[in-house]
Structures are given as structure tokens and as C-alpha cells.
Amino acid sequence: MTQFPQTLRAGATALALVMGLALPAAAGEVIAAVAANFTEPAKEIGALFTEKTGHTVTYAFGPSGQFYTQITQGAPFEVFLSADASRPKKAVEEGYAVPGSDFTYAVGKLVLWSADPARVDDKGAVLKTDLEHVAIADPKSAPYGAAAIEVMQKLGVYETLEPKLVTGKSISQAYEFAATGNAPVGFVAYSQVIGKEGGSSWMVPQDLYKPIKQDAVLLKTGAEDAAAKAYLDFLKTPEALEIIRKYGYVTE
């Protein structure tokens, strides 16, 4: 069985002390596994959550499939914010999460993006040109990668592009491949490029891929943790929803 470090909780407390946060006596800590595409909004939400409640959050960011495997192997996560809806539901079904605690916190959007301002037009025609590489997230563990495959199949370009795919272990790595020029274009989350200057992009039409519903769930390890429950409740507040929408997600 995989062994996980037990220093995450101590690290959160130490960080709070270093930052000079005044934590109330009842303040707690929550350890959250969060899909890589949600990194920036999660950080902003976490800071506001601490400000409002005194509870601290320790985040781990990465591919949802990898997190699910770690959860089944005893990782100390208390909250799971997945990039899909299936894994949180599976966590409930297999006894790793609290029944009835899963909900959709965001619906993601897929974009084809390039660091080159002239590379991608607003119809994605570049996919039918002689591309050297196309970056995507691993479709086996990252829902945005699976969505990218679906798009290419529906456009009839997958067979041509499959040998040219550069696969990142997460959507963050797929973005890095495109941002650094290791791939001229890449399928990334809209949240990763919204508000960024430079580059060019094509917002992939929603009818080319299944909705990327991103669900959160309370894991059994956090079932009795007031901070973990409070964090999930906070995700549903108007303040948190405003942050989520600011990063280009749709909320239900």
C-alpha cells in the first residue's frame, strides 16, 4: 500500500502562523485534492475561506484519475474536487466518500490555445493543417484530455493527429507544453488562459464534447471534520461562485 506523508496538516498550520493569520480557537484544517484545471480559483477561494472562517486549507493539485487512485490507497485527503462527475460518484459507491455529499461546483470549457498570437483562428481550422504536435492532458486520468479526443474525433482529424499528440500527465502540463512552444497548439481549460495577454485561441463549441461537469465530494476521512464540511459549504456561497465564474466556468 502506498504510504503518504503525514506532514500536510502540520504544513497548513505552519503556513497560517508564518502569514500571521489570527485563527480562532475552533479553527480547523482541511486537506483537499483538487483537479489541476481549478488551481487558480481554488487558491483564491481558499484565501477567502480562511479569511471568513479561520479554517485553513492545504491543497494538492493534479489529475483527477491519479487522485482517485491515491484516495483508494489511503491518501489523507478529506475533500475531493474532481474535473469530472464520475469519480466523486464512484467514491460514494465504493465507500470512500459520504453519500449525498457530492455536487457540481463548476462546469468547465475547453479551448484550443497557442502562445503564437497568429496560430489559432476562431474556428479551429489549424487542426486541419500540418501540425507538428498537439498538446493534450492524459485522457485516461484527465477529463479535459478525454474531451479533447472527443472533439478531434467529431471533427474527423483524430486519426491524422493521434501520432502527433503530446500528452501531459495533467491539464497543467498540457498547458506548459503549449506555453513553452513544445507543441504549437494545445487543448487546455479556458480557466488557464482567461484574462491572459497574448496567444490565440478557439473556444471549442459545446456540441463537440460532453459537458465537463466538475463535482466535489466529502471523503470519509473528512466526515467528522468541521473544517472539511465548512469548505464544501463555502464552495456554494455567492462569494465562491463569483470567483468560479470569474475564471470562465459555468455554475449550476
Swiss-Prot record:
Protein name: Molybdate-binding protein ModA
One GO biological process term: molybdate ion transport
UniProt lineage: Bacteria, Pseudomonadati, Pseudomonadota, Alphaproteobacteria, Rhodobacterales
GO cellular component assignments: periplasmic space
Assembly behavior: The complex is composed of two ATP-binding proteins (ModC), two transmembrane proteins (ModB) and a solute-binding protein (ModA).
Localization terms from the record: Periplasm
Source organism of the structure: Rhodobacter capsulatus
Function: Involved in the transport of molybdenum into the cell.
The organism's place on the tree of life at top rank: Bacteria
SUPFAM superfamilies found in the cross-reference section: Periplasmic binding protein-like II
InterPro entries named in the record: AvModA-like_subst-bd (IPR044084), ModA (IPR005950), ModA/WtpA (IPR050682)
